[in-house]
C-alpha cells in the first residue's frame, strides 16, 4: 500500500515512513483530570473517523485504554486481525497488555457509568485473543497522533 494512499481524502500530512497506512490511530482527550473525556479512532488509509465515544466523566488514561479496546473489538468483529493500532499512551498500551485498567479514579455515583464500561472492556480483554499489533505512536519523532483532538 502506498504511503500515504493516493485516495486519502483528508488534509493530514503524509505519514512517516515507519508508519503503516493499514492502521487506525486512537486517541483520547480530557478537559481536566478527571473531567469530560472522549476518544476516537481515525483510519490512517483514508483519514476517516472510524468511531467516537463520549464525552463522559473520566481521565485521559482511561479514554486511551478504552479507545484501544474499542478498536480491537471492532477490528475483530470486522475480521481485521492484522490491522495495526497506534496510540500515544504508554500506560494505556501496558494496561491492555495486562488486560486491566489500573486507574486510580475514585469510584463514585458520578463515575459508576464509566466503571461499568471499564469492566465490560476488561471482560472483553480476558475472554478474547487478538493478533493486531498495538504500537506506541512516537509523538516526538512523528508529530501528533492523527486521532489527536488538537486541544493542547
Please give the residue ranges for each predicted region:
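Flexible, glycine- and charge-enriched loops at secondary-structure boundaries
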Residues: 57-61, 65, 107, 111-114
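Short intrinsically disordered terminal tails
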Residues: 1-2, 152
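RNase H-like nuclease fold core
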Residues: 2-62, 74
